């Protein structure tokens, strides 16, 4: 390869299980094969006493070196070590994940010593491999790329992916959403048409799942809504089959292979192969010689059995479809095309469930499900680097959206959304806040992402402080908060105090959020389910604030000597007693909004009576 630098950019689909790379020049997209001739490369990195292997070579020797072969790193990136999904995944991973300041690190033996790598570093190794595959074909050094992420990735996961790109030595021109990239591949390919239409992208990969509804007209691709599950894919279907095989092996041999990483890796590889076979045939046999403790393993699996083992997971993929249609306000009948993306959409049962959901509608299979995302990323890379010269990309415009609302925590840990979910990016939104205490000179701005009223049920993205601000009475300062989401879906927040002009900002990066999958997957549906709780939480907080504010005013009245003298004997005592009852009610954690309102009313009556009978 020459030292000359390629003036274009490559498109990389950085997948959980497999990755893919492509280029776009003129009007031609090329998916680039690796040295084995495959168009997809396993997202595996293996460490040995002598070397580091990436891709096919790493996956091929995973069974011999399970503790030092890392995969599934996309399920770690941008997450906290204490995330329940990380904990659950760790149970099945043969490699070691350790806690370092709340962040997960992969621990391996490499070149004779123990090394710890962050998920970003492992992802960067896969990106370097994809870059090298492209360089071998182009014959020049590649420095620029567009990388894809699941549409439902939060801010932490997006920023971490961008960081992985930087670690790999790539200038990441853009982070784009996988279903949007696939829509470009479809919209510019066989699905090209000037007619306006609603296209549903159903993207089920090895480890993540996205559904996006786009409106496509000419070269304008507008995402109307997006939903998904950042922790569901083909790997999970393999695991369900693997668990069935483990039980069958134990039943036949009375031996438990759960603790043997090598046996589990061999069995998982056989399960993945069986799953693929069952997409074409109706039955297959898993056969592994000397699987564990000298025992051979053989099991016949039918397609029906595989579908039964994954029944819940398969049906669950329809929930985000329902969510997307609801959010977009589009009826099933108004969906013109359903496009399948991701290797797992080859499973016949998945196709049947989806087609039945849309009343037997024919599914669109004209694009290669493994390559569509890289194809779209390459088109975007070509446009951004000036390599795309065709007429069909001249008017290409991508309008993507924020998958979950972004905002700040107010007094009482109430979530104040600044950018609602579904907002087209890039965007700039402003909202004004004020202080809660007299002479307050410091204001904290905790930033969250999610759909719940109570911030503790959303994802923390980090916080920053605005200080010092001029001391004023509570409620007087005007604090303007600006949320700016760029084309990569990455957030920058700025807060300014208007009189002094003092400002502070944060680009949310590496302040990794405590994201549990159950939160990100169910945030919207939970928000519906717990709406009553959320409303009660808000009402109680407002009632509490009102009562506290009124008590403060009454205290001012009775402590003012001129006003106090005007009160009849006994009236002041009545007010004080009523006020004590109200304060006691405030202390009770289980008080409802109504309880607090009643106490406020009683206190108002006591004050009114005392004043009117002077």
UniProtKB/Swiss-Prot annotation:
User: Residue ranges of region Lid domain (SBDalpha)?
Assistant: 517-613
- GO molecular-function annotation terms? ATP binding; ATP hydrolysis activity; ATP-dependent protein folding chaperone; nuclear export signal receptor activity
Q: Does the keyword Signal apply?
A: no
| Amino-acid positions noted as binding ATP in the UniProt annotation, renumbered to this chain | 16-18, 74, 206-208, 272-279, 343
Does the record's keyword annotation contain Transport? no
InterPro entries, per this entry?
A: ATPase_NBD (IPR043129), Heat_shock_70_CS (IPR018181), HSP70_C_sf (IPR029048), HSP70_peptide-bd_sf (IPR029047), Hsp_70_fam (IPR013126)
GO annotation, biological process: nuclear export
Q: Where is this region: Inter-domain linker?
A: 393-403
Q: Name one GO cellular component term.
A: cytosol
Q: List every stretch annotated Substrate binding domain (SBD).
A: 404-614
Annotated region (Nucleotide binding domain (NBD)) at 1-392
Q: Which UniProt keywords apply?
A: ATP-binding, Chaperone, Cytoplasm, Germination, Hydrolase, Nucleotide-binding, Nucleus, Stress response, Virulence
Q: Where in the cell is it found?
A: Nucleus; Cytoplasm
Which PANTHER family does the protein's record reference? HEAT SHOCK PROTEIN 70KDA
Protein name in the entry: Heat shock protein SSB1
Where does this protein come from, organism-wise?
Pyricularia oryzae (strain 70-15 / ATCC MYA-4617 / FGSC 8958) (Rice blast fungus)
Lineage of the organism: Eukaryota, Fungi, Dikarya, Ascomycota, Pezizomycotina
Gene name of the record:
SSB1
């Amino acid at each position: 390869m020459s030292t000359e630098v390629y003036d274009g950019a490559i498109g990389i689909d950085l997948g959980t299980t497999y990755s893919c790379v492509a280029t776009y020049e003129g009007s031609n997209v090329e998916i680039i094969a690796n040295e084995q001739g495959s168009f997809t490369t396993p997202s595996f990195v293996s460490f040995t006493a002598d070397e580091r292997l990436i891709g096919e070579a790493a996956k091929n020797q995973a069974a011999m070196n399970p503790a030092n072969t890392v995969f599934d790193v996309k399920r770690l990136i941008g997450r906290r070590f204490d995330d329940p999904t990380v904990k659950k995944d760790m149970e099945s991973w043969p490699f070691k994940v350790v806690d370092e300041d709340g962040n997960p690190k992969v621990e391996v033996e490499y070149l004779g010593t123990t090394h710890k790598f962050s998920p970003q570093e492992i992802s960067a190794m896969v990106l370097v491999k994809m870059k090298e595959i492209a360089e071998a074909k182009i014959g020049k050094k590649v420095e620029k790329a567009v990388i894809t992420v699941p549409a439902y990735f939060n801010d932490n996961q997006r920023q971490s992916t961008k960081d992985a790109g930087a670690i790999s030595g790539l200038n990441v021109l853009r982070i784009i959403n996988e279903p949007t990239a696939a829509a470009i591949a479809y919209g510019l390919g066989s699905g090209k048409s000037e007619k306006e239409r609603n296209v549903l992208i159903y993207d089920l990969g090895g480890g993540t799942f996205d559904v996006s509804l786009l409106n496509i007209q000419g070269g304008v691709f507008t995402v109307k809504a997006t939903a998904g599950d950042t922790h569901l894919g083909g790997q999970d279907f393999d695991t369900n089959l693997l668990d069935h095989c483990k039980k069958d092996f134990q039943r036949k041999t009375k031996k438990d292979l759960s603790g043997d990483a090598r046996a589990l890796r061999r069995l998982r590889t056989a399960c993945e192969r069986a799953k693929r076979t069952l997409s074409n045939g109706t039955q297959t046999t898993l056969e592994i010689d000397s699987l564990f403790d000298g025992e051979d393993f053989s099991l016949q699996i039918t397609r029906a059995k595989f579908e039964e083992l994954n029944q819940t997971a398969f049906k669950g993929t329809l929930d985000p479809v329902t969510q997307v249609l609801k959010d977009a306000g589009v009826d099933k009948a108004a969906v013109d095309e359903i496009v399948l993306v991701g290797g797992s959409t080859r499973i016949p049962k998945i196709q049947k469930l989806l087609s039945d959901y849309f009343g037997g509608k024919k599914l669109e299979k004209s694009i290669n499900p493994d390559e569509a995302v890289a194809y779209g990323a390459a088109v975007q890379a070509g446009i951004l680097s000036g390599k795309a010269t065709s007429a069909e990309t001249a008017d290409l415009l991508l309008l993507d959206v924020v998958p979950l609302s972004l905002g700040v925590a107010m007094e009482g840990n109430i979530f104040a959304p600044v950018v609602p979910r579904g907002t087209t990016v890039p965007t700039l939104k402003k909202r004004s806040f004020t202080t809660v205490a007299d002479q307050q000179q410091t204001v904290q701005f905790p930033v969250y992402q999610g759909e719940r009223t109570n911030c503790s049920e959303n994802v923390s993205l980090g916080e920053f402080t605005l200080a010092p601000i001029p001391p004023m009475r509570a409620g007087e300062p005007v604090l303007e908060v600006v949320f700016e989401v760029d084309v990569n879906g990455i957030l920058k927040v700025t807060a300014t105090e208007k009189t002094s002009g003092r400002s502070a900002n944060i680009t949310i990066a590496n302040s990794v959020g405590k994201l549990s999958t159950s939160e990100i997957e169910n945030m919207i549906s939970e928000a519906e389910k717990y709406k009553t709780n959320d409303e009660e939480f808000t009402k109680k907080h407002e009632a509490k604030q009102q009562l506290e504010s009124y008590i403060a005013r009454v205290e001012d009245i009775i402590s003012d000597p001129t006003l106090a003298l005007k009160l009849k004997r006994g009236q002041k005592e009545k007010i004080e007693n009523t006020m004590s009852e109200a304060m006691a009610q405030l202390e009770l954690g289980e008080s409802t909004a109504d309880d607090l309102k009643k106490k406020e009313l009683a206190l108002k009556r006591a004050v009114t009576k005392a004043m009117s009978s002077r």
